Amino acid sequence: MREILPIESIKERDIDLVLLEELNVNHQFCEWFIQSVGLPEITAHEGAWRSITAYGKGETDILFSYHANDEKVYVLIENKLDAYFQHEQSKRYDSRASTYCEDGSCTVAFTVLVAPRQYCENQHDFEQYVTYESIGEFLRSTGGDRGIFKNHLLDIAIHKLRRGFQAV
């Protein structure tokens, strides 16, 4: 018998919502996420927001804010599943990060790509990245049935990429 998938097709927005939930309610995930890219250690959580447009410099898929001692940290997350980067997209992320620091919204800001491993390893626009595979493994190993289900959703997204998209 053929496996029945809980969802036929995963879109980037679906993964955004998984990330948004975890970054807002799962402190252990937040700590793991920032440690996996070597960001300053979290001392207080502020929150995460989806689809933030700022300064006329494009959109941030997810903006995650936390405190590291007396520093307010912004993490601008670009989630990429099966599309090419827009022209100078990473530069616009860097520009928004700099502007957030300059206008006092935060003390320090970082940009991070979240995507399937195949995508991350074949791009040169973002220096820091977290793979869908590592997120899925973390959720599977720490989140009980809920984490196993979310890992399954990420696996569906990863297989979607493998079936039809090649990052260049």
Name what the model sees in each region.
Residues 1-168:
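Charged, terminal alpha-helix-loop-beta segments
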